[in-house]
Amino acid sequence: MSETPAQSSIKQERISYTPPESPVASHRSSTPLHVHTVPRALRMEEDSIHLPTHLRLQPIYWSRDDVAQWLKWAENEFSLRPIESNKFEMNGKALLLLTKEDFRYRSPHSGDVLYELLQHILKQRKSRMLFSPFFPPGDSIHTKPEVLLHQNHDEDNCVQRTPRTPAESVHHNPPTIELLHRPRSPITTNHRPSPDPEQQRPQRSPLDNMSRRLSPVEKAQGPRLQQENNHQETYPLSVSPVENNHCLPSSPWQESTRVIQLMPSPIMHPLILNPRHSHSVDFKQSRHSEDGMNREGKPINLSHREDLAYLNHIMVSMSPPEEHAMPIGRIADCRLLWDYVYQLLSDSRYENFIRWEDKESKIFRIVDPNGLARLWGNHKNRTNMTYEKMSRALRHYYKLNIIRKEPGQRLLFRFMKTPDEIMSGRTDRLEHLESQVLDEQTYQEDEPTIASPVGWPRGNLPTGTAGGVMEAGELGVAVKEETRE
């Protein structure tokens, strides 16, 4: 009879005994602890989730029917209350956008379990891809169970929550949409929780280097930090743009924000870096060394630490080429107008100004005369360039059989020779003629026509006829427009 009370006492002690959860247990919320949520979270962290075969794709690729089947499977697997599937009429991409509060709103009795289950499935899928020298298994994937002990059913707070591991960062990164969880506990140069020494492995990941830099004073501030975090239970959604094709670290005042970064796929795409690529990442505000320190030797704050975690799944800049900028018309080693026109015709950026009508026949059209004149003036550093002046320079080439205007067609021209033929045929004569006329007509740069000056005998003009004077004037203006640097 004496053994029965002893045995019952031992059993009672086994049931009532609970291991210490954290050094900050005294700062928990006054709300009673819901013990039934803890075993579920721990069980999902420790055990593998065996989904049906048709649900073993990444959740981002789930269809609406797959989401409904997943809800039905979870309801049976975990003995949950009936889940209204019409509250989750969405595909896998949309499902990943939901916060824990969204899950609770759609399913008040089972939303928290569904959310944790989804996170564990994502982590389990990604863990098969991340075991590499750059992703140590002990540091990158698994988290100690005691770190994940939930205090109550209504608040999404942890006793000592470590920053998001690379696995958690990666599974929120589909090809064109980027979800980034902010840690619940802000880690700045003034507030840092104490790291778990058991989590420091011989193999070091970028996150390990940060935790080793914490001072004893900073470790002692963990209880106060947890008390502050009890008031941060909402996680609003916000859209964060990408500036200059770099993933910008958020400010320390936005640690409770769940950020969704939308990025066009042709410019930026996610890439799991290996050691070869890890040294080529350029963050906008600071560049960090491998041990998690900035150039001044000070430990970096939360946003920079999250950047280091994001090295495991970084958005690599794929900057569009500079040619997509607005063309300014400057072309190197191009002095003459006919050559400049050829260069513009060969560049698709200038099709709004000038383009080929028939490339085989060398027929081209000036689409925007005034715009083309501005390009030519910019190339020659002439702000007062107009199409009237440029057209006189074009007419100069009529006489040399280089360019001809198409009869009866406005702004339609034809090259009579290829650039090689022009350069090899009459280049010397062209240079000599342009140089000679330039010397005689320098002072008449902006005159539309050339008239005989008072007191200047007609015989001293370049040619002896009035028509010759006009031709020489046109030639002089054309040459002046081209040769003035």
Swiss-Prot record:
Modified residues (N6-acetyllysine): 11, 298
Listed GO MF terms: DNA binding; DNA-binding transcription activator activity, RNA polymerase II-specific; DNA-binding transcription factor activity; DNA-binding transcription repressor activity, RNA polymerase II-specific; protein domain specific binding; RNA polymerase II cis-regulatory region sequence-specific DNA binding
Glycyl lysine isopeptide (Lys-Gly) (interchain with G-Cter in SUMO2) cross-link site: 11, 284, 298, 399, 417
Domain PNT: 41-125
Positions with biased composition (Polar residues): 1-10
GO biological process, one term: positive regulation of transcription by RNA polymerase II
A matching Pfam family: SAM_PNT
Subunit note: Can form homodimers or heterodimers with TEL2 or FLI1. Interacts with L3MBTL1 and HDAC9.
Protein name per Swiss-Prot or TrEMBL: Transcription factor ETV6
Species name: Mus musculus (Mouse)
